[in-house]
Amino acid sequence: MGDAKEAGAEGPPAGAAARGGLSLLSQGESEESSAQGSALFLGGNEVKSRAVVKYSSAPPRTAFARLEEKTDLKLPPANWLRESAKLGPAGTTILGNSKKSKPFSSFGMAYDFIDSVGNDVDVVSDSENIKKLLKIPYSKSHVSMAVHRIGRTLLLDELDIQELFMRSSQTGDWTWLKEFYQRLIDQKWQRKKKSKEHWYQKAILSKFLYYSINGDGAAQPVSSTAEQQESSSSDQTNDSEGASWPAPFEMPSSVSEDPSASSQGSEPLEPSYIVGHVASAPKEQNLITLFNDGEHSQGLKNDFVRNILWTFEDIHMLVGSNMPIFGGGRYPAVSLRLRDNNKPINVLTGIDYWLDNLICNVPELVMCFHVNGIVQKYEMIKTEEIPNLENSNFSTKVIKDIAQNILSFLKSNCTKEGHTYWLFKASGSDIVKLYDLTTLCEETEDKYQNPFTMPVAILLYKVACNMMMKKNQNKKHYGTIRTLLLNCLKLLDKSRHPQIIASANYMLSELFQLDEPKKEENSESPLNENSDESYSEEEEEMPDSDENGSYSTSSDPSDDSKAVAIIKSVGELSVPEKYKSIHQIRPSCAFPVCHDTEERCRLVLSYVLEGLKSVDSSIKKESDLPAADPSTPIPLKYEDESSRGGPEGLEKQMALFLDKMGSLQKGNYSSQSGMIPGSWQHKMKLQLILKSSKAYYVLSDAAMSLQKYGRALRYIKLALQSHDTYCCLCTNMLSEVLLFLSQYLTLCGDIQLMLAQNANNRAAHLEEFHYQTKEDQEILHSLHRESSCQGFAWATDLSTDLESQLSVSCKCYEAANEILQFSDLKSQNPEHYVQVLKRMGNIRNEIGVFYMNQAAALQSERLVSKSVSAAEQQLWKKSFSCFEKGIHNFESIEDATNAALLLCNTGRLMRICAQAHCGAGDELKREFSPEEGLYYNKAIDYYLKALRSLGTRDIHPAVWDSVNWELSTTYFTMATLQQDYAPLSRKAQEQIEKEVSEAMMKSLKYCDVDSVSARQPLCQYRAATIHHRLASMYHSCLRNQVGDEHLRKQHRVLADLHYSKAAKLFQLLKDAPCELLRVQLERVAFAEFQMTSQNSNVGKLKTLSGALDIMVRTEHAFQLIQKELIEEFGQPKSGDAAAAADASPSLNREEVMKLLSIFESRLSFLLLQSIKLLSSTKKKTSNNIEDDTILKTNKHIYSQLLRATANKTATLLERINVIVHLLGQLAAGSAASSNAVQ
């Protein structure tokens, strides 16, 4: 039995298992193969049974010694009551196999096989209890059992009423139960002593077993001491046979567990309940279980020889058994029994033997018959034959029905975890009652008078802990785990068990995943999934004997209102599925796991607070702590910026912070409360504080997403205060915790930045920041016991100064980055590292823009002084430094797009510097300065770097287009300034013209007029303006230049080309009629200038004709102006129509009037010159129909124009209408003349 194979995992069923019967081992199999079980048919009734030995402490099986006939069993063998390896560790106490179980035997097994409790197994109990339950319909004996529910598992233990009431007489602990029992069940209870026959049978059985393992078959005299102990056993065993019941929640003294201590004949007292460390419970590292079993144990040992996972039909049971099993030779596994030949085997005995063999998977039974202690014969009986023995006939199918009904009854009614239920049947009664002892106990003065409370609480905790530690545990069980822990907490007194309470609260907080949004789950758990399966376990009793005396029955069972449920007749248990349909399984109290972020975090914090209270209450040095009232709000200190020193003061605070972080790496430790490092209080408080910091971080992140920035800052402040306390307590900072801190500071930086950008709602943010819940105050009070919590005050103050907020945000990101440098966190968390550097680059851009805008504001306020102030220069330096650092941040993570944006902003800063250096004196004397040129060229360099950073437009088209536009603007601005304020004192005119031309052409290069975008009209306007300026420049050069005819011709061609391009581009725009008109008038002037150098009338007429064509093409511009004036004229409902027409807000009225006057004069001049030339030509030539038509048309138009211009009262709109009309006639006349020629 001691082979390692016995503890192996259950294997697949073989053989006839698929056929659904019951199988036992054949003669050639050993017990180790029992895990393979299959099926056997018993008397025509199919009953499936499967037994897997999960643990065995028995020695290797040996054959029993077959005693010679006439051996006198009344004589003690030489080895009697001495420890024997063949009988295992229970050798000296076995007294046969009728040893009583201990009050908490199921708990010992549950602790050892914690994986099975709550889910896989229906019942955990001693085999004797199982047998006693299954014999209820057949037996008149009393039944008294304690029932506890853990998940879907029931724990059954014998509740020895006689033992309890004897204790009550001595200590008064169970007075309430004794009074209840006497009132409702037996009014005249008195202790019943066991008969001499009972002790005779136990002694003769014990001697028989020792003879069987001795092997010599001889009776040998024993010492007088042994005889005395045998004779005294009848008096002593009554008190010592079972375990002593402990006073509720007493810490026990140490009790010897050495088996040799009881070798004098009496059974040993079990040690008071000290739950040892359970080696078989899984201990995984993913959940820190800070509860030390040994410190709060109540000695619940699993001391069964073997623990068996027994499946009886659909009922799964974990059963403890001490039955000796013999083997060897022809019989590899047999059980050994002693029977009086004069007493036939009855049904109770048969069921007893059959169940023992089924549970232990023993195929055969060897029966030794005796008469008056004299051995007569041996008989071999197969297990499957036991139900058909003479005088012992019973139906295995009925036994199966009984088992299923009892389990269904118990599961339907024992619904409250943590409650102790009492299943009771009086001797000779047919009524079975179920009481809730916990409810009855609560009616007494001290509700902790239940000795089951502590073992149940520990088991609830252990099951929950075991479920939590399984990495593959589905989250649907979290509701079950929470229920287990809450029920555990209900059972415990806060003042007596702070460690368990703190640990359970910590585990409750661990149930809620804070790092990701919780998806909605149905809280389906083992507690909600009670099946009608049932397994019950009984301890072995001597059939037909009533060891505890007789119990009278109540006169009317229906009068018992205290009972939770009643089986009115034990005969009902034999009816198939009697209780499956009648007793509905009540839903468990499994709480759904919430999925709202704030609710989840608040629940976590409530558990953390309870845990912290438990820890704090257990620390004795209360008098050494500063007084604090949890109900008094702890002020969140708010310092004025002047006292804190602004952004400059942050440098010193950051240095102190980084020095502190460095010291943590060296393992420094400081606590104000005097906690001892390594103590459970220290370990637990560390974990609880860390959990609170995580919860506050998640709350802050959630508030941030809701744009509640004041609330977010309050939560991140609490998170950092928690972390600061953690740092004070921690002796060895884990990299994971440092990563948390880096994340907290990153979020804090985000919040400070958003507060800076949302200054208009500052009052609301300030109110949210200063609000505190009572829960937050109490947590903070606990934190203040260990630390001042001021380590991160520099990061969490709500400032009213924009610069300070931006600086604090930047310092938060810098601190987060510094933390990543302390260990290998940077390489281990590349995503977080990239995010931190992105934020550093972004905040430095924000600060750079802030200083740049301040510099621009100072510049705009500067009126007379031409020199740049020191304040401006200082702001430039700060801005440039921020941009430079930000660019480095983005380049280090290869973020080309953001690097390009910062390079673009640096270019803008250079342009502001250039603008600051322009002369502010007399505009007429101003020249483009070298400083302006220097800064504009620097700006161009930064824009070109930005383009090189992006590489191609495909990477980020919007940024690419923006940089191109800024670059084009810079070239255009520089060229315009050089053209308008030519530095003639330093450079020759030709050089200036060359530089202007080059800059304008480069501006055109980066001005994309073809791509369709929102910026396209601006690009078209910019390009048209550049062409106009270039044309004007070449026009001016042509006017001023003499000599070099080749150069003059070149300038003439360039001017005409650029005028033409400018006109085409302005023609595309709907909102630039004045610009188009100006370009066309300049083109006319250019034509007039050309005409002055012409000598022939033909050439002049050609030039005049081209000029008039240009005039005709201005009709589009006048139509745009006309349309706009008409639209504006129609808007006013009353008033002067002329005033309304002239008061155009979108048109520059003066500009239009000026251009209109010039246009009228030039048109008049061109028409007059045309008339003169055509008239002189007509005198020299005749029959020129075209010229006659043109001359006639021009005269008619000229006369109309003169009359129109003579009318000084005409409105702008009327004058525009005339021009449009005349231009239409001019265009028609030209077309008519062309047709006439054809």
From Swiss-Prot:
Residues 530-547 have a biased composition (Acidic residues). Residues 1-38, 220-268, 517-561, 620-647 are annotated as: Disordered. It comes from the Eukaryota. GO terms for cellular component: nucleus. Pfam families: EDRF1_N, TPR_EDRF1. Keywords: Activator, Nucleus, Repeat, TPR repeat, Transcription, Transcription regulation. InterPro entries: EDRF1_N (IPR056582), EDRF1_TPR (IPR056583). The keyword rRNA processing does not apply. TPR repeats lie at residues 693-726, 914-953. The keyword Oxidoreductase does not apply. One of its GO terms (biological process) is positive regulation of DNA-templated transcription. It is found in: Nucleus. Residues 9-38, 223-241, 253-263 have a biased composition (Low complexity). Transcription factor involved in erythroid differentiation. Involved in transcriptional activation of the globin gene. PANTHER family: ERYTHROID DIFFERENTIATION-RELATED FACTOR 1. This is Erythroid differentiation-related factor 1. The lineage of its organism: Eukaryota, Metazoa, Chordata, Craniata, Vertebrata.
